[in-house]
Swiss-Prot record:
InterPro entries: Ribosomal_bL28/bL31-like_sf, Ribosomal_bL31, Ribosomal_bL31_A, Ribosomal_bL31_sf
Keyword line: Metal-binding, Ribonucleoprotein, Ribosomal protein, RNA-binding, rRNA-binding, Zinc
Required co-factors: Zn(2+)
UniProt entry tagged with the keyword Cytoplasm: no
Pfam family, one: Ribosomal_L31
Gene name linked to the record: rpmE
GO molecular function, one term: metal ion binding
Protein name in the entry: Large ribosomal subunit protein bL31
Recorded GO CC terms: ribonucleoprotein complex; ribosome
Entry function: Binds the 23S rRNA.
Similarity comment text for this entry: Belongs to the bacterial ribosomal protein bL31 family. Type A subfamily.
An individual GO BP term: translation
Residues where Zn(2+) binds: C16, C18, C36, C39
Assembly description: Part of the 50S ribosomal subunit.
Species of provenance: Treponema pallidum (strain Nichols)
Amino acid sequence: MKKGLHPRYEETKVVCACGNVIVTASTVKDLRVEICSACHPFFTGKQKLVDSAGRIDRFNRRYKIRG
């Protein structure tokens, strides 16, 4: 490898808006993210499932689409 050509690969702190801090390695010094696996609804099990079956049925009735 040539000297001075490649970026430095160093320890990085990834800080989430929820306060969670993840230490990893990267060429970027520090990162701030809005959402992480500790607070994302998909990973915490608090996600909301949208039931669109009623809307689809209403659309099909309105336009008389048989399915």
